[in-house]
Amino acid sequence: MSEFFLHSFNALSHGLIGYVVPFLFVLTIVVFFHELGHFLVARWAGVRVLTFSLGFGPELIGFNDRHGTRWKISAVPLGGYVKFFGDDTEASTPSPELLANMSAEERAGSFHHKRVGARAAIVAAGPIANFLLAIVIFAALFTFFGKPSTSARVDKVEAGSAASAAGFQVGDIVLAIDGTKIESFSDMQRIVGVRAGEKLNFTVKRGTETVQLQGTPEQREMKDPFGNVHRLGVLGITRQTAAGDVVTERVDPATALWLGVKETWFVIERTLAYIGGVFTGREAADQVGGPLRIAQISGQVATIGIAALVHLAAVLSVSIGLLNLFPVPLLDGGHLLFYGVEAIRGRPLSERAQEMGFRIGLGLVLMLMVFATYNDILHLAAS
């Protein structure tokens, strides 16, 4: 047992040295825009913003702007927060004593004295900013680097594979999967890869005819170029590419923006599908990762190039935006849940009920962090 933990520690200490800078680069971009969403809508709604912090804990460096907001970088770079006038904590829990003794002028700038719709808009602005950031990043990547458009042609069918059982033949070109247009081999790989065990309907061009096939991708463990193991859906089809076969299509900014929206929705859809699969037992929870895993992936992706690292930032931005919308007290979604109840009841929940909710939310978040970190350590030790 001691050897296992020693090996884990050595893997962590050796690996994280090369991962810290890319990790902080990615996380800082995502957190900054999340908090900027809260900040901008709060200012628009007339709320006085006391603090805009990247990180938690003691302040390392900061300054005050002309509106009295303290902008700072804090010691623990694993998130951030915006603190409003009237907040008791960084999680925007109210300070009953402060709220009770406010003057009319102070109430005008207090977050907790705003109408429930304004408060909901301020809270929702963080996750929305994450989604918008992802759309813009994806769109920029499509604009500057183009869109893969190598046809989804079948050059080889693995014997005994799902593709063989479905009736695929060499020379087939996949046109659509479950009605979704397939424009490239990578399009097909992405859909098949996340739908192991699901029956899929394929529209296939075979010579001059169009045929319909049904196949169920099988789940296999595949290693990426960095040695990380992923469980993916596989048909057993190979596309052999020669010089000139790999085509990248340039797209205009408007098309790139639409592709950015589609890419963002794809990440949202697959993330929700994975979470649903964990709860139903179809997916293993060992793929849930925390800061250590993100740091490792950031360092690995950084070796490919800045475009790949920025792409990772977009994916992480979607994930953080989505996570924050979960109806768990302490997260943005928990606040929105409370505001929804307040809108229906015509008055907020009692202080005791809200405090109990935040305690439960804190417990759930801490348990998730411990579980994710445990997974991270096992993953790093194995690699």
Please place each PLM-identified region on the residue numbering.
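Pore domain of cation channels
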Residues: 123-132, 312-325
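Alpha-helical transmembrane segments of integral membrane proteins
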Residues: 22-26, 31, 311, 315, ...
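PDZ-domain C-terminal substructure recognizer with occasional recognition of PDZ-binding tails
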Residues: 169, 175-176, 190-231
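Internal alpha-helical transmembrane segments
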Residues: 33, 44, 80, 84-91, ...
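Conserved PDZ fold ligand-binding element
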Residues: 163-185, 264, 357
